[in-house]
Amino acid sequence: CGGSTSSSDSSAAANTGDSDKVITVGATPTPHAEILNAAKDALEAEGYTLKVVEFTDYVQPNTALVDGDLDANYFQHTPYLNNFNKENGTDLAAAFDMHYEPFGIYAGKTASIEELADGASVAIPNDGSNETRALLLLQDAGLIKLKDGIDPTSDATKLDITENPKNLDIQEIAAEQLPRSLADVDLAVINGNYALQADLNAAEDSLITENPDYAKVYVNVVACRSGEENSDKIQALKKAMQSDDVKKYVDETYKGAVVTVF
């Protein structure tokens, strides 16, 4: 509603080559860049050109945003963003919520949790908030016990394990390397986006998925520089990305491995 007016005005501005009508967003390839591309037509109707810059790690999208090379990024959940700001003294903000991706435990050399041998190897992500998430999932699976008070907002590590009855060898690995680690470890706890890139679906392929209440704590957000949340570009991006068409695309494409929250 009201879109046609802003669309015609914006299109006229875009035809003049106005760089303010180009929205540059950094994203990891799956599902983030794919979801962004599903919103391109809606942005074009509003007179904006969407430029998606793909990254394969979790650091460069934020540093590029801080440096002004991007208008926004879309790859991280709120606990990771908060932790990044804390560790780097940056001031990035969550502009709006998009989706969550359930973590899963996947079979590597061992086919099931019940078959795990004493001393079996388990790979988990090595960055703070995602390591916490993985450890909580291992606890839910009955494989370890963590110190009292550890919850999804904590910054837990292996040192917070108080009981490890199977003497699991828990290996901290860069999140993007986890799918490749499956050939070398008994189990791996894998982030939803990297699982999808490896053709793994948490809802269908994992041995166990995380508690939905925990998963919702890790809502993936579109982030921008603090103070720009209400800028024309960010608001146009929000309108396009939180559309019914994008929701339908996510539901039909990812079949429960990506869950929208709008």
Segments from the language model and where they lie:
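Bacterial lipoprotein signal-peptidase II cleavage site
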Residues: C1-D20
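Short, well-ordered beta-strand elements
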Residues: D18-T30, Y48-E54, S121-V122
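Short helix-initiation/N-cap motifs at beta->coil->alpha
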Residues: V52-T63, D151-R180
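Alpha-to-beta junction loops
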Residues: V66-Q76, A120, L143, P165-D169, ...
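Ligand-binding "clamshell"
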Residues: N83-A95, K109-T110, D184, V189, ...
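A conserved helix-loop-strand patch within extracytoplasmic ligand-binding domains
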Residues: A95-I144, K247
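A bilobed periplasmic-binding-protein/Venus flytrap-type ligand-binding module shared by bacterial periplasmic
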Residues: P102-I113, Y218-S231
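Periplasmic-binding protein-like
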Residues: T132-Q139, M241-V261
